[in-house]
Design a protein with these regions (language model features):
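Beta-propeller blade termini and top-face loops
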Residues: 1-189
């Protein structure tokens, strides 16, 4: 069993042995630090995704996409920073006495991730700052495919089509910007 928690904590639990192991990409406790001071920026609910083509391949995301082929015993970074990396939105939050930097306020992260169930190595990443990237070569190169005119927003989910490798759907929200309208996008290329 695999599970994640705030600040990028990722654990693996053996039900048979009743043992838990930390398999975090960046095993650090950044509580109290602003996001710009962290080596990796993880969203409170960061993606943990297994490849539909090979269940020994696992992905997770910070501002980077990470891949493991050994149940998290080691990780390989397969992307650059796929966010806007706006450091003005990565400062410590909270008051002058108590800083509230537990992970939920971390911004400029990859919020959603998917691998095409049709084409092995076609990977989709969406950030909480409104960018969508795709790789068609297993993470070697990434292309920004953010819809033209999309303002800063949170890419809530990307769903790769189960029928066509070039098709994906994205649900986008801007509630943090005072905009409650729904945004839905589809690409076929």
């Amino acid at each position: 069993t695999f599970g994640g928690n705030y600040s990028g904590y990722l654990g693996r639990k053996s039900q048979r042995l009743n043992q838990e192991q930390d398999i975090s990409v960046y095993p650090n406790n950044p509580i109290g630090e602003g996001a710009k001071d962290r080596g990796e920026r993880f969203q409170w609910t960061f993606p943990i995704v297994f490849s539909p083509h090979d269940t020994s391949v696992m992905y997770t995301t910070s501002q980077h996409v990470w891949r493991s082929t050994n149940e998290g015993m080691s990780w390989t970074r397969i992307s650059g920073d796929l966010t806007r990396n706006d450091t003005t939105k990565q400062r410590a939050s909270g008051g002058p006495i108590t800083k509230d930097n537990t992970g939920v306020e971390v911004y400029n992260t990859i919020f959603t991730f998917a691998e095409s169930p049709v084409a092995k190595g076609t990977l989709w990443a969406g950030s909480d700052c409104g960018l969508i990237h795709v790789s068609t070569d297993n993470g070697t190169t990434w292309t920004n495919v953010t819809p033209s005119g999309l303002p800063e927003a949170q890419i809530s989910i990307i769903e790769a089509s189960p029928f066509d490798a070039a098709t994906a759907y994205a649900a986008v929200t801007r509630y943090k910007h005072g905009d409650d309208a729904p945004y839905l996008y589809r690409t076929t290329n």
